[in-house]
Design a protein with these regions (language model features):
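C-terminal regions of proteins
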Residues: 268, 272-346, 350-365
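Conserved, well-ordered alpha-helix/loop/beta-strand core segments that scaffold catalytic motifs
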Residues: 122-134, 193-294
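Catalytic nucleophile-elbow at a beta strand-turn-alpha helix junction centered on a G-D-S/GDSL motif
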Residues: 63-81, 309-312
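Hydrophobic membrane-insertion alpha-helices, especially the h-region
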Residues: 18-39
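Secreted/periplasmic serine-hydrolase-like ester/acetyl group-modifying domain
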Residues: 140-248, 336-365
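Membrane-embedded segments
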Residues: 72, 76-159
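Alpha-helical transmembrane signal-anchor/signal-peptide segments
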Residues: 40-61
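N-terminal Lys/Arg-rich, disordered targeting/topogenic segments
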Residues: 1-18
Length: 365
């Protein structure tokens, strides 16, 4: 008679359990290390490149109160429009979702992200970034996207924004990108790794109190371009922004800030294309360059970098001027009779003037 030999697993149940626990522990450690170290190694953007803090500061603001107007765009919005002044002068609630060289797809996803939390009455988009049809630099992507809360919107924004040398996984696990910052760490990196950082902006407005006059006597000839056609990709994202606003019942307003520095020249040919797009789609478009005198801008006192961008004194003038347009033409309501909004915004106005006083003391000659 043949006998069948049966092999019995003699590994004790306790040993198998310990092995399973070790595997689970290893996985937890693998996941915990990035979670613990990434907040330490990620740039804090508190003293240098403050623009990198702008994206994340929005969430605390919208948790307090919603906004009737969102400004979207590059430095021509976050250094030009002051929500505290809009409130003080007109009772308009607003926020600036801008960033350094914020390209059109960045702005589209900034808007889509904001609409997860609120539905403003109007979105004001600055059109200068329409000149760009491709991702530019990783550092600008990082400043725009690292502070965005995780969602499908952020995932799509990363894919749309990455340069050829970037990888999606580096955004999921920032430790992979910033591991070499060990030698650059400061006390702020440890102090603010897991706690709230001080605000660098006033509702998205990044203040500049310095004064460096523009050379108004100098003549310059803009660089001639081979092709003045605005890139198709940029216009596609502008149209996506328009459709998104339309779906949510939001008015989209296009603007060009009044600065027109030689290095960042706004060509008439570009302006004509934007005006034609606005006309074809029933949008308001304000090119504020010709309105500089009416706004009251004096580029001997209202710029901090020789005419490229406005300082706080120029931004206050522009905000008061454009606030009148928002009130009179676009019927954005005065919310100063709203008790909750008034309390929140009075704190923001006070914080704005406190920052202005402190910064003026630092920049006095």
């Amino acid at each position: 008679m043949e006998h069948t030999t049966v092999t019995v697993n003699k590994t004790p149940a306790r040993t198998r359990l310990l092995r399973a626990l070790c595997v689970v522990l290893a996985i937890l450690i693998f996941l915990a290390v990035p979670a613990v170290l990434s907040p330490v190694l990620e740039p804090k953007y508190l003293t240098q490149s403050k623009e990198g803090s702008l994206t994340e500061e929005y969430y605390a603001s919208v948790a307090e109160t919603t906004h009737d107007v969102l400004f979207i765009g590059d430095c021509e919005v976050f250094e030009s429009f002051i929500p505290a002044i809009l409130w003080e002068e007109y009772g308009i609630t607003s926020y600036v979702r801008g960033g350094a060289q914020q390209l059109v797809w960045h702005s589209y996803y900034m808007l889509a992200d904001a609409l997860r939390y609120e539905t403003p009455k109007a979105v004001v988009f600055n059109v200068y970034a329409l000149k760009y049809g491709e991702p530019q630099k990783e550092e600008y992507n990082r400043m725009a996207l690292d502070g965005m809360e995780w969602s499908s919107v952020k995932a799509e924004a990363i894919r749309a924004s990455m340069t050829r040398d970037e990888y999606f996984i580096d955004y999921v696990f920032p430790l992979l990108r910033f591991h070499s910052r060990w030698s650059e760490l400061t006390w702020d990196d440890l102090r603010y790794a897991y706690g709230d950082k001080p605000l660098v902006s006033d509702s998205g407005y990044l203040m500049q109190t310095g004064i460096l006059p523009a050379d108004t006597q100098a003549e310059f000839t803009p660089e001639l371009l081979i092709d003045y056609t605005l890139p198709a990709t940029a216009m596609e994202y502008l149209d996506k922004m328009r459709r998104l606003c339309e779906e949510r019942g939001i008015e989209l307003i296009l603007i060009k800030a009044p600065t027109n520095f030689w290095r960042y020249h706004w060509y008439d040919e570009w302006d004509e294309q934007v005006a034609a797009y606005a006309d074809a789609n029933g949008l308001a478009y304000y090119n504020l360059i010709p309105e500089a005198s009416e706004i009251g801008l004096d580029m001997s006192t209202d710029t901090y970098d020789a005419g490229a961008h406005l300082n706080v004194y120029g931004a206050e003038k522009l905000t008061r001027y454009f606030g009148g347009i928002l009130r009179d033409t676009h019927e954005i309501p005065d919310q100063r009779t709203s008790g909750n909004a008034s309390a929140v915004w009075q704190e923001r106005v006070n914080a704005y003037y406190d920052r202005k006083t402190a910064m003026e003391a630092e920049t006095k000659p």
